[in-house]
A protein has these predicted regions:
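Conformationally flexible catalytic loops at phosphate/diphosphate-handling active centers
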Residues: 8, 188-280
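Peripheral docking tails and interdomain loops at the edges
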Residues: 13-14, 343-388
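N-terminal glycine-rich anion-binding loops that anchor highly charged ligand groups
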Residues: 32-69
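Glycine-/acidic-rich phosphate or pyrophosphate-binding loops and their flanking alpha/beta elements
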Residues: 35-40, 265-288, 301, 305
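Thiamine diphosphate
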Residues: 58-149, 154, 158-182
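Structural signature of the thiamine diphosphate
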Residues: 160-224, 339, 345, 381-388
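Generic long, charged, amphipathic alpha-helical segments
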Residues: 300-333
Length: 388
C-alpha cells in the first residue's frame, strides 16, 4: 500500500496520517518546555512506530521508559526489552526484516556492545532509527557526555546525524524516517546527541499537533524484499559464498559494500531538502571560524558572543550530518577563513581530522579545544584558543 493512500485516514488513537511535508513545514506548532528525553517521547508519539526494543543504559534509559508509556497508551505497535544491547540490535534487525518501522536507543558502552549489528543493518538495508545519547566509553567509566562513539558509527555504512538542541532532536527523529525509508536510500540512521546536555536539560521545543502522525512505513517500497520470518526463503548462514568460490565472495561483498555507501550518498539530496542543508552558517566571511557539531556548536555560539563584545569577529559553521559528509559545503564555507577552530567533546579529535581531510590548506585547522570524559567546555576556553 502506498503511504499516500492512507493520508487523511486515522490510526487507532485517532491521529490523522498526514503528509510529512505538511506536518513538518506547515502545521501549527506549540511551544513546550521539555527535556530531551521527553522530546524523544513526543516525536515517537507522532512517528507511527511498529516496534520499539529497549535496554537501559544512562543517559537514554529515561527515554526508553517514556516510550514504554506510549506503548501502554497504544501509540506504538509493540514494545519489549532485550537481554543486552547486542540482543536489542539483533532483535531490531529481525523486526525490520519483517517489514516493521523500528526504533531503539543506546549510549556509550551500549553502542560498543551493539557495534557488530550496525554494519549488518546497513548491509541488509534496514531503515532502523537508533538514538545515540553519547557518553564516555573508556575505563574508568563515565556516564557524562563524550562523543568518541560517533567516530566508530561513521564507518558502519549508517547515516549519522548530530543534533545540537532538543528542537533538532524532535524534528530530525521524524524527518529521519522520511530520509532513511526512501527506496534509493533505505539505510539505518544513527541520530546522535550529547548525552545529559540534551537529554536531561529542559528547553523550549515547538511541537507539531498531537493529532497528526507520519504515514506508516511501507515495506513493499524496500529495495530488498522483506523476509517471511515464519518461513524464511533462504538459509542465511549455511554454505556461505566463500565455501563455493573466493571470487564470488569478493565480488559479492565488494559490490554490495560499494552500494551501501552509494546509498548513503543518494541520501544527500533528501537530507538537504528535509534539514534545509547539511550545514548551517553564520558570518563565514570572518577570518576566524568555529566549525563543529552537536552541543559544541552551542558553546561556540556563546564564545562568539563574548568575542563580539570585545570587537573580535568570528563566524560559525554548524555541521548537521556526518554521514553523508558535507564536503563541498565545508570547502565553500571555509574558503575565506585563515583560522578554523574545531572544539570537540572527545579525546581523539575526529571532527578536526575529518575537516583537515576535506579542505585545502589544512594547516588552517586548529584541532581544539577538546574536553573528554564528561568535562564541560566553558566558552571561555574557546575564546582563549582563538585569542592564542
Amino acid at each position: 500500500m502506498e503511504p499516500t493512500s492512507v493520508i487523511g485516514t486515522k490510526n487507532k488513537k485517532g491521529q490523522v496520517f498526514t503528509d510529512p511535508r505538511i506536518m513538518m513545514r506547515e502545521a501549527p506548532r506549540t511551544p513546550s518546555f521539555y527535556t530531551g528525553s521527553e522530546v524523544i517521547k513526543e516525536a515517537i508519539r507522532r512517528a507511527s512506530i511498529d516496534v520499539m526494543i529497549a535496554y537501559p543504559i544512562t543517559p537514554q534509559s529515561e527515554a526508553a521508559a517514556l516510550i514504554g508509556e506510549l506503548f501502554a497508551e497504544g501509540y506504538i505497535g509493540d514494545y519489549f526489552r532485550g537481554e543486552s544491547e547486542f540482543a536489542v540490535m539483533s532483535q531490531c534487525a529481525g523486526a525490520a526484516f519483517g517489514g516493521a518501522r523500528v526504533f531503539t536507543t543506546t549510549a556509550g558502552p551500549g553502542t560498543m556492545r551493539a557495534m557488530e549489528n550496525f554494519p549488518m543493518w546497513a548491509g541488509a538495508r534496514l531503515p532502523i532509527q537508533c538514538i545515540v545519547t553519547c557518553r564516555g566509553i573508556n575505563s574508568p567509566l563515565s556516564i557524562q557526555p563524550d562523543t568518541i562513539e560517533i567516530s566508530y558509527l561513521m564507518q558502519t555504512g549508517m547515516l549519522v546525524w548530530h543534533a545540537e538542541t532538543a528542537q533538532d532532536f524532535y524534528d530530525w527523529i521524524l524527518m529521519g524516517y522520511m530520509v532513511s525509508e526512501e527506496p534509493e536510500v533505505h539505510l539505518p540512521l544513527a541520530l546522535c546527541c550529547d548525552g545529559f546536555f540534551v537529554t536531561h536539560t529542559k528547553d523550549v521545543v515547538d511541537l507539531t499537533p498531537t493529532d497528526m502522525c507520519l504515514p506508516p512505513y511501507d515495506p513493499y517500497r524496500s529495495p530488498v524484499p522483506c523476509m517471511d520470518m515464519e518461513c524464511p526463503p533462504v538459509r542465511m548462514m549455511r554454505d556461505p559464498f566463500i565455501m563455493k568460490s573466493n571470487y564470488i565472495s569478493y565480488a559479492t561483498h565488494a559490490s554490495w559494500q560499494q552500494e551501501v555507501w552509494a546509498a548513503a550518498e543518494r541520501s544527500r539530496k533528501h537530507t538537504i531538502a528535509w534539514l534545509n542543508g547539511l550545514i548551517e552558517t553564520e558570518d563565514v566571511d570572518a577570518d576566524v571560524l568555529i566549525v563543529t557539531s552537536g552541543t559544541a556548536v552551542s558553546q561556540g555560539r556563546e564564545a562568539i558572543r563574548l568575542l563580539a563584545d570585545e570587537g573580535i569577529r568570528v563566524g560559525l559553521v554548524k555541521i548537521k550530518t556526518l554521514r553523508p559528509w558535507p564536503e563541498e559545503e565545508i570547502k565553500e564555507a571555509t574558503k575565506h577563513a585563515t583560522h578554523i577552530i574545531v572544539p570537540e567533546f572527545n579525546v581523539i579529535g575526529w571532527m578536526a581530522k575529518e575537516i583537515k581531510a576535506t579542505i585545502p590548506r589544512s594547516e588552517r585547522v586548529i584541532a581544539g579545544p577538546r574536553v573528554c570524559g564528561g568535562m564541560t567546555m566553558p566558552p571561555e576556553i574557546i575564546v582563549a584558543e582563538i585569542k592564542r
